């Protein structure tokens, strides 16, 4: 459900012009913030930290609703449970988790830039320098390292003191540099909020593209049904047995439908209809189709003419994504 509107995705030629490929996709939320990215190019660098799907959905809904108070979208590493807080200017502090237990410190989480192997190297050095007595690594899926000290040497230590001693605090500064949503230019954002708000305004503009296409597709079908009705009304069923060949049938269809816009495939489709399709009950089906398509086009046009309705539909689809995500968690 993250990706919508596959039939209106802008296309471009591939490197040799042999096929068309997507210029970009149309996700409901700004996926550039989901997994994070780090990179360097000539004159530019980017460092985008990952976020949770839930937070991105909530931020997108807030932007759709034009809320002045925007939710915090703190970095989130799904494989870590460390504490995170913003410290201003797109900088964040990550803090590991520990428990002080008698003469031991139990480490339950590391900051994102500190791997288990690097931390164990650090502990080995601290053990060599007699800063700690020893340590036991009981980590499996989750981090669990018991760092042992001499009896009484850490009496009164707080978790904060233990974190500082073991250097389980790190900082990262985000630099949000991305290709714009159409994939044409490099753009730098001063904040995650600005990026999300900008994305939402870009994404909602494609709802107009969606409904223009829906109207065009429905109109194409309506024209064919109206042409079929005219063929009934203008005596094409009676003409068919007299026609010498298919070319005469096509010529007759063109005469009857001269004032209706249909293309050659639609003309061929009319000419190829089996005889039972010219019965009275089939004619009634055509009348029903015309009425239904006309009503559908009217509904689509009402949505296209009202930006608030298109925004509301966008909101409904993001809300449905939120519901699905909550079920799958």
Predicted regions and their residues:
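C-terminal interaction appendages of subunits in large macromolecular complexes
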Residues: 4-5, 24, 31, 35-329
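Conserved mixed alpha/beta core segments that line enzyme active sites in large multi-domain catalysts
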Residues: 2-30
């Amino acid at each position: 459900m993250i990706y919508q509107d596959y039939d209106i995705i802008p296309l471009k030629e591939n490197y040799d012009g042999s096929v068309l490929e997507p210029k970009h996709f149309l996700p409901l939320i700004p996926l550039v913030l989901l997994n994070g990215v780090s990179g360097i190019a000539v004159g530019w660098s980017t460092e985008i930290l990952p976020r949770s799907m839930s937070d991105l959905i909530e931020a997108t809904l807030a932007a759709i609703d034009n809320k002045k108070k925007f939710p915090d979208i703190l970095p989130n590493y799904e494989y870590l449970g460390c504490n995170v807080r913003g410290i201003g200017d797109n900088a964040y502090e990550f803090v590991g988790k520990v428990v002080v237990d008698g003469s031991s410190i139990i480490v339950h989480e590391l900051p994102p830039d500190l791997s288990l192997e690097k931390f164990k190297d650090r502990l080995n050095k601290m053990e060599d320098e007699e800063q700690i007595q020893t340590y036991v690594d009981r980590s499996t899926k989750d981090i669990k390292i018991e760092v042992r000290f001499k009896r009484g040497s850490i009496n009164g230590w707080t978790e904060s003191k233990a974190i500082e001693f073991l250097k389980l605090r790190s900082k990262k500064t985000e630099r949000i540099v991305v290709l714009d949503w159409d994939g044409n230019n490099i753009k730098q954002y001063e904040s995650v909020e600005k990026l999300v708000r900008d994305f939402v305004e870009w994404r909602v503009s494609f709802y107009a593209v969606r409904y223009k296409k829906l109207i065009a597709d429905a109109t194409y079908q309506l024209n064919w049904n109206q042409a079929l009705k005219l063929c009934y009304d203008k005596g094409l069923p009676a003409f068919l047995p007299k026609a010498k060949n298919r070319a005469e049938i096509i010529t007759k269809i063109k005469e009857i439908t001269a004032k209706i816009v249909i293309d050659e495939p639609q003309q061929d489709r009319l000419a190829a209809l089996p005889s039972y399709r010219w019965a009275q009950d089939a004619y009634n089906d055509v009348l029903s189709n015309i009425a239904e398509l006309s009503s559908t086009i009217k509904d689509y046009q009402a949505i296209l003419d009202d930006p608030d309705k298109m925004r509301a539909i966008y909101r409904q689809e993001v809300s449905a994504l939120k519901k699905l995500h909550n079920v799958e968690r």
